[in-house]
Regions:
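Long, low-complexity, Ser/Thr/Gly/Pro-rich intrinsically disordered segments that act as flexible linkers
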Residues: 104-115
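An amphipathic, aromatic/His-enriched active-site/gating alpha helix that lines ligand/cofactor pockets
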Residues: 24-38, 52-60, 64-105
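A general structural signal for well-ordered alpha-helical packing
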Residues: 3, 20-23
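Beta-propeller fold detector
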Residues: 40-42
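Short, surface-exposed ligand-recognition loops at beta-strand->loop->(often short) alpha-helix junctions
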Residues: 11-19
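Active-site-flanking beta-strand signature of metal-NTP-handling nucleotidyl enzymes
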Residues: 2-9, 62
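Carbohydrate-binding/catalytic loop surfaces
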Residues: 44-52
Length: 116
């Protein structure tokens, strides 16, 4: 499984509730066309804890999406870049509300695990 962490800030004057609504619609559309396995809700950073040690990045908002494999990840990227579907229009509306966006992907490993 591949995971994608999106970290970002909302531009000044943008409405969090509108972003959440668009994000939920975006996920519904991506699930309907099998472009993601699952995704978590949008969230806010909890930086006033010793567990948050990242001083290099200041983003305050996050989301996490999960993809079956590299093929699904790449297909989702191509789908969004095509800008031809309702979900891609929603993605563009969301992206225009963001600033300081950074995306990080990683893949699960099965080292030391029996996969039979």
């Amino acid at each position: 499984m591949i995971h994608m962490l999106s970290s970002f800030d909302l531009k000044p004057g943008e409405d969090w509730k509108v972003l959440v609504c668009d994000y939920d619609n975006f996920l519904t559309n991506l699930r309907a066309v099998d472009m993601i396995i699952d995704a978590g809700p949008l969230g806010h950073r909890v930086e006033d804890t010793p567990m948050d040690t990242d001083k290099a990045r200041t983003q305050s908002c996050f989301s996490l999406m999960r993809f079956r494999d590299r093929a699904q990840l790449d297909a989702a990227y191509a789908y969004i870049q095509a800008n031809t579907q309702p979900s891609t229009a929603t993605h563009l509306r969301m992206y225009r509300r963001l600033t300081n966006a950074v995306f990080l992907c990683w893949e699960d490993t099965n080292l030391g695990k029996d996969t039979t």
